[in-house]
């Protein structure tokens, strides 16, 4: 089965992290930002990925395009229960919004993508959506990379695997896709700490003073936000800047043909800035679909910087990282969009998650599966 190929990548990477994970727990201290990927990396079984994607991305399309005939292909798709007439009327209005969507309008993100398992299956479902709308596989593969799939992770090596998996999936449908330049919105979250801010004066050549100053101010704001970004990952709250303006500012580089000690490394700085702009825009966007298996870690086990950030921005859900991610993913998802997550089940009954339950009460739950123990062989006795 094709799905097994990406599963192998994920399992190999999880077992690669076994020793670093054991070492992090054995030291009996706070988990550092370097250790968080190994400690929280947990590969999502294929059937759970399919269930989440089919009932979020798949449902979004099917509810707006009921005659597309796709849901018959989805083993884990659950039909909606019969609703009261008042609810049916509200749903009919929402589905008008879905019906107006074209395939390229649907942006999906996995903000904790790991090795990319969720993104790869989402690619398959998106391909079915595009084909049902009359696209060829070749054109659809390019469009999915450019318009639909987004992913983030704090782990650089996981990013490399996810990028590889997504591009190989694209090549499955378009054998020439690696021959040209293609946009792939899959990123390892990077920090701005190493940016040489003295180089900013070399950018914005040819722009008028108002635009140039606005771009510089916004870029400095982004760099400030992304300081120590690997401590926080996708829970970082990024403002929605004028991303086109920032890209034009960085592209308009001018050192007057002079090479000085001060200008050495400007091209490297431009490359770093463009990467940070891409990451920032991805974190600031709203998505029609958010699907992820978030990290499970008590915030008290994190270092002081993570603790302080969570208390400042997610104080109501500071018990565990998975609760923080429920709130964050809710904020990343458009109104009437779909959010699919695997979480531990404590949020349903423990007093420390009471505020989270209030957030969830304001969201319509389409379906929920209580898996019980041993859904993940690696988590002894835990329930999701």
Locate each region found by the language model:
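Conserved phosphate-coordination/catalytic loops
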Residues: 43, 267-274, 316-324
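Residues that form generic nucleotide/phosphate-binding pockets
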Residues: 15, 225, 249-252, 276, ...
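Signature of N6-adenine DNA methyltransferases within the class I
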Residues: 120, 127, 131, 154, ...
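Well-ordered alpha-helical segments embedded in enzymatic catalytic cores
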Residues: 48, 275, 324-328
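Class I S-adenosyl-L-methionine
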Residues: 1-144, 150, 158, 294, ...
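Generic alpha-helical segment signature
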Residues: 5, 138, 239-242, 266, ...
